[in-house]
């Protein structure tokens, strides 16, 4: 409670702002990233699938991705219900706080091929610090799932 400055992600930021109403957001990292990278969002989460599993179960992967897409859309359209459910199954802030945070979470389902430019921009930033952070080089085409 005594920090002058902090870098906080959602839903922690909404929790802080609820407990300390005078708290101000000075810099929005998502907005700064968009300014630096021509409006592109940065990737926050990825689904990684073992190549052998994908070969054996392509329909399962396709159906799973469709469900992830549908779920992400539902969460954005129903933040209160999503917050209530999520608070029951995970150690998260209470629903009133979590429901305020959901619209700020930048939840979006983006297919791998379409996400590739944003993923590569993000990985290049990491590689500038140390190429070892990304395994020495950018992933090749096989890294990005293509629905068939």
Q: Language-model features: where?
A:
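A local structural motif
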Residues: 2-4, 22, 96, 113, ...
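A generic structural signal for short, solvent-exposed coil/turn residues
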Residues: 17-18, 39, 99, 135-137
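Short secondary-structure capping/turn micro-motifs that flank functional sites
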Residues: 14-15, 92, 142-143
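Pocket-lining segment of extracytoplasmic ligand-binding domains
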Residues: 2-85
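Secondary-structure end/capping motifs
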Residues: 54-129
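Conserved C-terminal helix/tail region of periplasmic/extracytoplasmic solute-binding proteins
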Residues: 120-148
């Amino acid at each position: 409670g005594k920090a002058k400055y902090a870098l906080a992600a959602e839903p922690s930021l909404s929790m802080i702002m609820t407990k300390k109403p005078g708290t101000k957001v000075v810099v929005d990292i998502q907005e700064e990233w968009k300014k630096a990278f021509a409006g592109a969002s940065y990737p926050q989460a990825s689904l990684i699938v073992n190549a052998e599993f994908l070969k054996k179960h392509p329909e399962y992967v396709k159906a799973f991705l469709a469900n992830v897409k549908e779920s992400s859309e539902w969460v954005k359209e129903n933040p209160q219900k999503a917050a209530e459910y999520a608070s029951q199954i995970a150690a998260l802030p209470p629903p009133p706080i979590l429901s305020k945070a959901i619209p700020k979470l930048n939840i979006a389902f983006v297919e791998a091929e379409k996400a590739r430019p944003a993923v590569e921009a993000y990985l290049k930033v990491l590689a500038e610090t140390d190429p070892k952070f990304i395994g020495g080089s950018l992933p090749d085409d096989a890294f990005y799932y293509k629905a068939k």
